[in-house]
């Protein structure tokens, strides 16, 4: 079955086999289909400041453990790594950002279209 749209909200930063997931998602889209991805700006100083001053404080007050220990293992992909992966498997990747600019944002949103079917198939065949 093929889909018009596949949407991912705050998941790609957690996926260890991200290229495989993106390639497979691209193959599940109809020709004019769209993959929509929203992610935190993991790897940026602004994102780190955001979670350390909110969730990090709350987590420490509740459990007396540094949240940074968890974050090292929770977010395995940075925003730039995710964007690079999307651009490899899709011809058209448009980004918008929650913040002043790409670098000064907390959250990123990507709309990906025109999957590069040949790259997806090649990656999935050689990844076995």
Tell me the role of every PLM-derived stretch.
Residues 1-2:
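Short conserved loop adjoining the S-adenosyl-L-methionine
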Residues 5, 16-30, 34-124:
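S-adenosyl-L-methionine-dependent methyltransferase catalytic module, highlighting the catalytic core
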Residues 8:
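Active-site T/S-Asp motif of two-component receiver
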Residues 11-14:
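Hydrophobic adenine-recognition pocket in adenosine-nucleotide-binding enzymes
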């Amino acid at each position: 079955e093929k889909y018009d749209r596949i949407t991912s909200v705050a998941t790609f930063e957690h996926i260890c086999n991200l290229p495989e997931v993106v390639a497979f998602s691209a193959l599940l889209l109809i020709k004019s289909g769209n993959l929509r991805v929203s992610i935190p700006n993991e790897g940026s100083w602004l994102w780190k400041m955001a979670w350390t001053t909110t969730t990090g404080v709350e987590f420490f007050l509740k459990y007396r453990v540094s949240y940074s220990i968890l974050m090292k293992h929770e977010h395995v992909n940075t925003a730039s790594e995710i964007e690079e992966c999307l651009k490899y498997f899709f011809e058209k990747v448009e980004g918008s950002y929650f913040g002043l600019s790409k670098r000064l944002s907390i959250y990123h949103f990507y709309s990906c279209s025109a999957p590069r079917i040949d790259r997806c198939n090649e990656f999935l065949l050689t990844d076995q």
